[in-house]
Every structure is written in C-alpha cells, then in structure tokens.
Amino acid sequence: AEMYMGLVELGVGLLPAARGSLEMLERFRAGCPDDPSFNPLPMIQGAFMNIGMAKVCVGAEEGRTFGMLRPHDQITLNPELLFHNAKEMVLGMARAGYRQPRPAKFRLPGENGATAIKWFLDGMTRGGQITEHEFKIASLLSRVLTGGDTSTRVKVGQQHILDLEREVFLKLCGEQKTQERIQHMLTKN
C-alpha cells in the first residue's frame, strides 16, 4: 500500500510530542523482559535512530519494519472501504470484549543511557554530520527516550515519559534556532 509515514519533527527543531516519542519507545521496547539487569539501550537506540534521522517509510510493509505500524495494524488498499473496514474492526473488538490495555511501565537506563547516546552524537558533531543545534535537540530526545532521572532498577510509567516529552518540546519551542526553522518551513516549504 502506498504510504509515507515518519516522525520528522526534528527537521524543524522539535521532537515528536503528544505521545509520538512514547509510542516509538513502546514499539521498540515490546517484548523486552521485565528484568532490572536487562540492558534496554539497543532497543532505545532503534527508536532514537528512527526519530533522530527523521526516517520516512514508503509503503505499509516498510512501516512495519520501521515500527511505525504495529504487526496487528490493518491495511486497507481501497480508500472507499476505509470507513467500512474501520467500523467492522471496532464492532469486532466490541463483540470480543475488548478492554483497553493497562498503561505500560518501563525500565529505562536514565542518564547512563543518555550519556551513551550523547557520546555517539558528539562524534557526529565533531565529524560535521550534525550541527550544534541538532546535537542539542538529539541530546534532549535521548533524555526523553532513556527516561530522564531514572535507572533500570525503577519502573516508570507512561505519564513520566509524557511529562518529559512535554518539558523538552516546550524548551525547544523557546529556542531561537527552532523558531527560525519553523518559520523557514512555514514560508518556504
């Protein structure tokens, strides 16, 4: 199915908010053991790279590969059937007794994980691959995805991640370079 999907907010100096970062984190953390000794950093790095590189998938199957679509997300090729298929899916869920899942809890590496990602980013900055402002944005994204002030010994809830998302989003909205990027996008693109 033809589709273009991605979290491209970093291009204008922001990060995906309103659950965008949280959703990507949840999708890459799916299936991870609930074990304080488990290192979640490789999964977090997958989410980080998708968001940080503003990857855009072309097509539904690539969307699954990138974690933009979940394995159980349905695809409707015919736009005329979209409403019908959605209605049938919802009715089927209701008949099956669907209940909203409990909010996820995460064991995240906190500042230790963010430091590892920042080390990688520092190399990209020194190599001229990203600007200082992009380093700042990506560093703040790493703080969100690694859980801020926490460690794998502690479980944090979705609201904790959402609070970090909001805090970082608002901080970036106040950055002059972000405002310039947004203005450029609105006037030139």
Regions found by a protein language model. Give the residues of each.
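CoA-thioester-processing core
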Residues: A1-N39, Q45
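Intrinsically disordered, low-complexity segments enriched in small/flexible residues
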Residues: E26, A30-K55, G59, P71-D73, ...
